[in-house]
């Protein structure tokens, strides 16, 4: 449920640069033709693969066809560091909205080992959503030999 158009625009640019897909779950805090969304994504929108799903169940059903994926929920309360996960191609990385993160009912669908956190200093609430996605995507890509990078 992204709320801030520039964050999603930045993630669109990230997905274009890493050949990853972006799946957004409604409700969105903006329209997909939002000026700030387009501005943040610059001219990368045409290179990004973006899908919008009505809810998390629909997203999960769409991505688990034809073969189920491994799913990881990114949360500040996760038990597993992003640097301890062994990512494989096709893994799904799930992030919450900017103001409140993933809802508890979504987090509860993930085994404790699949609840992932990005290490931060104590007493700091969270990273910016776009930055958190970048940290996770680049770590997963690095572990897979930056396949497709120049």
Predicted feature locations:
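Post-transcriptional modification and biogenesis factors for structured RNAs
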Residues: 1-150
């Amino acid at each position: 449920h992204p709320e801030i158009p520039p964050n999603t625009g930045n993630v669109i640019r990230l997905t274009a640069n890493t050949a990853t897909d972006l799946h957004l779950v409604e409700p969105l805090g903006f329209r997909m033709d939002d000026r700030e969304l387009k501005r943040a994504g610059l001219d990368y929108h045409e290179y990004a693969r973006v899908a919008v799903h009505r809810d998390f169940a629909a997203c999960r059903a769409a991505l688990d066809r034809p073969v189920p994926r491994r799913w990881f929920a990114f949360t500040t309360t996760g038990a597993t560091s992003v640097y301890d996960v062994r990512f494989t191609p096709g893994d799904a990385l799930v992030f919450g909205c900017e103001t409140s993160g993933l809802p508890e009912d979504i987090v509860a669908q993930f085994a404790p080992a699949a609840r992932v956190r990005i290490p931060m200093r104590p007493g700091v609430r969270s990273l910016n959503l776009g930055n958190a996605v970048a940290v996770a995507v680049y770590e997963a890509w690095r572990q897979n030999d930056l396949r497709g990078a120049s």
